Amino acid sequence: MSNNFKDDFEKNRQSIDTNSHQDHTEDVEKDQSELEHQDTIENTEQQFPPRNAQRRKRRRDLATNHNKQVHNESQTSEDNVQNEAGTIDDRQVESSHSTESQEPSHQDSTPQHEEGYYNKNAFAMDKSHPEPIEDNDKHETIKEAENNTEHSTVSDKSEAEQSQQPKPYFATGANQANTSKDKHDDVTVKQDKDESKDHHSGKKGAAIGAGTAGVAGAAGAMGVSKAKKHSNDAQNKSNSGKVNNSTEDKASEDKSKEHHNGKKGAAIGAGTAGLAGGAASNSASAASKPHASNNASQNNDEHDHHDRDKERKKGGMAKVLLPLIAAVLIIGALAIFGGMALNNHNNGTKENKIANTNKNNADESKDKDTSKDASKDKSKSTDSDKSKDDQDKATKDESDNDQNNANQANNQAQNNQNQQQANQNQQQQQQRQGGGQRHTVNGQENLYRIAIQYYGSGSPENVEKIRRANGLSGNNIRNGQQIVIP
């Protein structure tokens, strides 16, 4: 017993199982307890592998669980195919020859040998993987489990051979042809159904089809999967998962090639030939006539399948074209209704424009009439105002003329009065002077000339005399004025 902490820690680590693997937890725990017990006893001198090995092992276990689910689904389809193959073998004519009891066992030993070969190859691939080996005792335990599995498989197969051994039946060529033809028709119908399911379900359908084709060659192996479920350990589960993965990948690649190349009929014929060969290998006499009838029926089925594909394509084109035509018709109707609506809208807008223009013209004519009436009224008012102003002016002129006439009359009367007053003053002055001469001013006479006329000299003294005599202060005298000359 080692005291290394790392060894104890790694030994106590447990793998993580998924929920779908809970039904086998008891078997796994028993196997793990046995392996741990052996590890603690015999692994004391061995270098323990690194931690990454445990992680890789857990990944393989998870992949094994996932592949086991797919394998279980394919196993159910295998059982159904085996049951159908058993019914076909009962109807087939093979018991007339002496080698009937030997050939089925030889045939059934072939799948056993192939299965052991797959398990051994998978185990060898796992051993050749660059991952470190955990311990030698674990591999020894795995080998022992494989041997037990092989022995249990052999026993189960022998029982299945005895149960499925065909009954003695005398066959003719016609019976063999009819039997193989019926069998071929059944297999063709089933493969058509399987192919349609594979086309719609993807990888799951491809795995089921691959399992069906693989089991068709080994129609007598009834109890293989049940023995594997209860006796194989984790290594056998991983190996079977790898084998199933390889078959699934191969089947999926074949399906993809068939789907892209349009050769589904050939694939159906190949699967039918494999199934018929696996079911008819129990007899050595059915080698020539059944194969010929199978080939003829296979060709007919291929032609029928191609015709069905053409009909499907035509139906698919019709399904594609009908919605397109309906969409085009709907769009055309919408376009027509839209054009009519736009046309009506345009007509309505034109009518509205015409009505608006007519209304605007009527409004403009009304405005013009009102403006003309206003201008007439204004001209009339201006004319009346002018005439009134003229009348006022005329009356004013008349009043001014009357007033001027009155003023002139007053002025004339005042002038007359002044003249009379001046005459009176002059008379009074003449009376005061007495006998002096009087001179009436005429034309342009002045005091200087009057002094020269009367005194012979126009000296200032003479002029001053005349002034004093007449009471003048200046030289201004007027026409018609009488001057006293002293």
Curated annotation (Swiss-Prot):
Region described as Disordered: 1-314, 351-440
LysM domain residues: 437-485
Residue ranges that the UniProt entry lists as topological domain Extracellular: 2-204, 341-486
Annotated region (Elastin-binding), positions in chain: 14-34
UniProt entry keywords in alphabetical sequence: Cell membrane, Membrane, Transmembrane, Transmembrane helix
Membrane topology of the entry: Multi-pass membrane protein
GO cellular component, as recorded: plasma membrane
Protein's recorded name: Elastin-binding protein EbpS
Species of provenance: Staphylococcus aureus
Gene: ebpS
